[in-house]
Amino acid sequence: MISNVAGAGVRVGIGVFVFRGGRFLMGCRRGAHGAGTWSVPGGHLEFGESFEDTAVREVAEETGVQIGNVRFGAVTNDVFTGEGRHYVTVWMLSDHVAGEPVVLEPDKCTGLAWHDFDDLPEPLFLPWRQLVRSPHFDAIRRELSAAR
C-alpha cells in the first residue's frame, strides 16, 4: 500500500472518446502531470456536474468539437506515485456531431489527431495504459468498430 501524500485526495478525471469515421480524437498533453503523453480529451469533474455534462464541456473547451450520444465506457484507478496524485478516471464514449478539432488550450495540449486502436501514438498517458490493461478495453474497441 502506498502511504497518502499529506493533503492529497483522490480526484475524479473524465476521459472522453470522440468517435468519428472509425477513429477517435487524441491530444498530446502539456503543462500538467503526464506532459508529453497522449490521451483523449478530458478534465476534472466539477462539483454537481454529471459525467456526461463534464464530457461535453471538456471536449468543447479543449477542441471546439460538439459531441452527442455520450455514454459510460469504463473506469480506471490511477495512482501517479512519482507526482503524489491519485485519480479515478471515468472514461466516456461519444460521437462527433460537429466541428473540426482545434487546440483551444495550447498551454494544456500541443496537438490533436484522429487515431484508431491500431495506430496509437506513444507514449500514452498513465490512465490510458491502465485502460489498455483493463477488462473494459475490448468493449471500447467494439464500440469503435460498431461506429464505423
Q: Which stretches of residues belong to each language-model region?
A:
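Acidic/histidine-enriched, glycine/proline-rich intrinsically disordered or flexible terminal extensions
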Residues: D138-R148
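NUDIX/MutT-family hydrolases
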Residues: W91-L93, V102-H136
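A conserved beta-turn-beta hairpin within the catalytic core of GNAT-like acetyltransferases
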Residues: A32-W38
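The catalytic Nudix box helix
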Residues: V40-F72, M92
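Conserved N-terminal beta-strand and adjoining loop/helix that marks the start
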Residues: M1-F24, V75, V90-L93
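A generic structural micro-feature
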Residues: A6-V10, T37, G82-V88, P106-C109
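Active-site-adjacent beta-strand/loop module that shapes the phosphate/pyrophosphate-binding cleft
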Residues: N77-P101, P135-H136
